Design a protein with these regions (language model features):
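Loop-to-transmembrane helix entry/capping segments in MFS-fold secondary transporters
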Residues: 2-11
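Glycine/proline-centered helix-kink
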Residues: 14, 19-27
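Residue-level recognition of pore/gate-forming positions within transmembrane alpha-helices
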Residues: 19, 44-48
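Structural signal for membrane-spanning alpha-helices in multi-pass inner-membrane proteins
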Residues: 26, 51-55
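A membrane-interface helix-boundary motif in multi-pass transporters
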Residues: 30-45
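Basic, ligand-binding patches in group-transfer machinery
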Residues: 54-112
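The AdoMet/dcAdoMet-binding core of the Class I SAM-like
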Residues: 125, 132-254, 261-264, 276
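Class I S-adenosyl-L-methionine
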Residues: 264, 270-300
Length: 300
């Protein structure tokens, strides 16, 4: 009894260290390097192996052994059953669907959410209303069809970069996309128009933004999402100051946001943009959660 407290404390400490190590290894090593299906299969195999001693002890009960065998066989067959992903990337379950109503239409679905629609035969076709609104904001800021230097926070299917390349010949676009699996899908399944000057960098957009040269672009488009949320580190005043630094005088920042209800997040982000840009405008359709916010030092 005199050592009970010490023993319990040691066991608790060992358990805590194990829990922390397991969480770190799973979150930063396993999930980022090994497909989830492989992780689940590996865990299943380990559980089956751990159960073998108990199965051996229960060998006098054929019914129990048969049940265990059926369950184990069924579990091992699961990874080969049809799933919901074409590609399991480090960040997403990615699915590319063909549009039965448009021959060149492709829908990029990430984790069950529609992220990008691309018509590989017609880069000027913008299927989603929020993308059309962002394009309208760009055209309002830059009349005509003059070439632009643009930077994109987030890539997805590269819908707007290919639209700019088609509607404003000579436009140069740089894209920061964090998921190499999505970039691979773009390269293999969603080819860019011939002659499109689009450079895609596999990197966190916040880090990529910091690498952009001062006064180097006319347009910055924020289109990065984790699910339905904009990554928080792209919404701060510090990040927006970096956007302003990269923009040439009179340049424009257009960001896509999703919010509902009282639009507390959109209101907060508008206030944040107002700390950096002299002129800020918010656009959106009633009854939807999609909003576009544009900021610039130029009132146009």
């Amino acid at each position: 009894l005199e050592r009970t407290g010490t023993v319990v404390g040691q066991l608790s400490g060992i358990g805590t260290v194990g829990a922390i190590a397991g969480t770190v290894l799973t979150g930063f090593v396993l999930v980022s390097r090994i497909p989830v299906t492989a992780i689940l299969l590996g865990l299943g195999v380990l559980l089956v192996l751990a159960a073998l001693p108990f199965a051996w002890s229960a060998r006098r009960h054929p019914g129990a052994l048969a049940t265990v065998g059926v369950l184990a066989a069924g579990g091992l067959a699961v990874p080969w059953l049809p799933g919901g992903c074409d590609v399991e990337t480090a960040y997403h379950c990615a699915l590319l669907e063909e549009d039965p109503e448009r021959e060149g239409g492709r829908l990029l679905v990430l984790d069950g959410l529609r992220h990008s629609y691309v018509d590989v035969d017609d880069p000027e076709h913008l299927e989603f209303a929020y993308v059309r609104a962002a394009a309208a904001a760009i055209d309002a800021a830059y009349a005509g069809d003059g070439a632009l230097d643009a930077y994109f926070l987030g890539g997805g299917g590269l819908t707007l970069p290919r639209w700019l390349a088609e509607t404003r010949p000579g436009t140069s676009s740089t894209v920061s996309e964090i998921d190499p699996g999505v970039v691979q899908i773009d390269q293999e399944e969603l080819p860019l128009p011939d002659g499109a000057d689009v450079e895609v960098r596999v990197e966190d957009a916040r880090l990529g933004l910091g690498r952009m040269a001062t006064d180097s672009v006319d347009l910055v488009v924020g289109d990065a999402f984790g699910g339905v949320s904009v990554p928080w580190h792209l919404t701060t005043e510090e990040a927006l100051a970096e956007v302003d630094r990269a923009l040439r005088p009179g340049g424009t920042y257009v960001v896509n946001l999703i919010d509902h209800g009282e639009m507390a997040f959109v209101r907060a982000e508008v206030r944040t943009l107002q700390q950096v840009f002299e002129h800020v405008v918010a656009l959106g359709e009633p009854g939807t959660g999609a909003r576009r916010v544009a900021g610039s030092s130029d009132p146009r």
